[in-house]
A protein has these predicted regions:
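Secretory targeting and sorting signals
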Residues: 1-23
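Short, intrinsically disordered, low-complexity terminal segments
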Residues: 12, 20-22, 56, 75, ...
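Short loop/turn segments at connectors of secondary-structure elements within structured domains
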Residues: 17, 53-57, 102, 115
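Short, surface-exposed binding/anchoring microloops in extracellular/periplasmic proteins
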Residues: 24-72
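Aromatic sugar-binding surface patches on proteins
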Residues: 41-44, 82-94
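Short linear motifs in intrinsically disordered
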Residues: 49-51, 92-100
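Solvent-exposed serine/threonine-rich low-complexity stretches and specific carbohydrate-binding patches
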Residues: 70-86, 123
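Short, exposed beta-strand-loop hairpins at the edges of beta-sheets
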Residues: 96-123
Length: 123
């Protein structure tokens, strides 16, 4: 039994050591959340959610690099989603592997909420 535990621990440490670096992140600020999928400085998909439903809920992505803000997308209508008793508004973008500068922040902004979560893009 002790041998199997040692072998399992060694295997787990080797598996974790060889895992590729990735740029996946999930961040929440108040009622707003941001999810980013990609690798390194390249982002494949980004999306966000806001707690609760509302009419006219829209969102957009922007970056901040060295204090300068740049809008990445235009305003996009969010889709209201109900899962059991949970209600939220969801929006997604396919960024097709768009590259960002190292150290920039990818952020989401909703027109009906105050939170603006950001994920740092880095190598």
């Amino acid at each position: 039994m002790k041998y199997m535990t040692t072998v399992a621990a060694v295997f787990l440490s080797l598996a974790c050591a060889t895992a590729p670096a990735h740029a996946d992140a999930s961040v929440k600020d108040g009622k707003v959340g941001l999810s980013v999928k990609g690798k390194g400085l390249s982002v494949k998909q980004a999306g966000g959610w806001m707690d609760g439903h509302g009419t006219g809920v829209r969102a957009r992505l922007y970056t901040v690099h060295k204090g300068q803000r740049t809008d990445i997308t235009r305003w996009k209508d969010a889709t209201p989603v109900t899962a059991g008793t949970t209600q939220f508004s969801n929006v997604d973008w396919n960024l097709n592997g768009r590259s960002f500068r190292n150290g920039s922040w990818l952020c989401i902004e909703f027109n009906k909420a105050d939170g603006t979560p950001c994920a740092k893009i880095h190598r």
